[in-house]
């Protein structure tokens, strides 16, 4: 099944599962690959949610895997990589009461991706540990060169942040107020806009904001996991790292996703552990770049 179908079925019962933002991602590949989620800050990675599964091994065996039987397969199928150990036929995962969701969108526009722009990007990232303390997650994007016409470009930062406890839009704005105030004072004249929207359930948010990216594009991808210490240590070094990571991407971009936090760090998978990359447990950010084919030269 795909995530949209599972979200809909769970929502009808007042429940939610840990899943992603795309309509048509299959639950099997998502879990086997680890599966980060905006709900991870509360409940952990998708792989941490598996309770049991049925698989077909390369030799044709049909096995039930869980913490008590075929535990080696059970470990490997939770984050060990898709199509590596066999085919996932069905899976049982944890569910949770669906939370109301407050969404804050934040956008910064600049005429060019100069030093000020990258300092602003680094500053926002340096505040991720503060936001994570409120169990906030988010999908930000950085576009150093964003075409607005055939001949003109701007630099763009756009982000969607979620709070999953029913906090009002006004309260969410209050959490971000010191961040926005600092940007406005430190870099006067910054074009910054933000707004909040409240949703009664996670699925209601998903229906309105799911990923609509087209399939079939050519991209070169790269990523790093960043810990809170990296984000809050040397600001100059962080700024240079963000600039180096994103500054030569042409009309491509980067995504400093805020998807770690307490839920990922403190997750207790069935059997005590799983195959999720251990660095996820101490990271807040999945920083990825997506270089559109042919965008640099």
Could you tell me what each predicted segment is?
Residues 1-297:
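Soluble FAD-dependent oxygen oxidases
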């Amino acid at each position: 099944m795909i995530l949209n179908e599972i979200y809909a079925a769970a929502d009808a019962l007042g429940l939610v599962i840990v899943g992603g933002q795309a309509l048509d991602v299959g639950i099997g590949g998502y879990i086997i690959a680890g599966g980060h989620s905006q709900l991870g800050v509360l409940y952990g990675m998708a792989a941490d949610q598996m309770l049991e599964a049925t698989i077909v091994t390369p030799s044709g065996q049909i096995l039930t895997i869980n913490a008590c039987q075929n535990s080696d397969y059970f470990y490997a199928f939770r984050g060990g990589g898709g199509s590596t150990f066999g085919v996932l036929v069905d899976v049982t995962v944890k569910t949770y009461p669906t939370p109301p969701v407050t969404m804050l969108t934040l956008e910064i526009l600049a005429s060019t991706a100069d030093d000020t722009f990258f300092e602003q990007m680094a500053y926002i990232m340096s505040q991720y540990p503060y936001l994570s303390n409120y169990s906030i997650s988010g999908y930000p994007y950085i576009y150093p060169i964003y075409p607005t016409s055939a001949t003109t470009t701007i630099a763009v930062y756009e982000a969607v942040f979620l709070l999953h406890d029913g906090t009002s839009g006004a309260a969410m704005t209050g959490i971000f107020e010191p961040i926005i105030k600092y940007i406005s004072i430190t870099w006067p004249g910054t074009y910054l806009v933000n707004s909040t929207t409240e949703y009664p359930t996670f699925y209601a948010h998903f229906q309105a904001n799911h990923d609509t990216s087209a399939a079939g594009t050519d991209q070169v991808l790269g990523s790093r996991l960043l810990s809170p210490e990296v984000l809050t240590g040397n600001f100059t070094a962080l700024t240079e790292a963000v600039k180096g990571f994103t500054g030569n991407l042409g009309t491509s971009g980067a995504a400093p996703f805020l998807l770690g936090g307490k839920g990922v760090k403190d997750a207790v998978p069935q059997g005590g552990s799983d195959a999720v990359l251990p660095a996820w447990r101490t990271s807040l950010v999945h920083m990825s770049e997506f270089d559109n084919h042919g965008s640099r030269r």
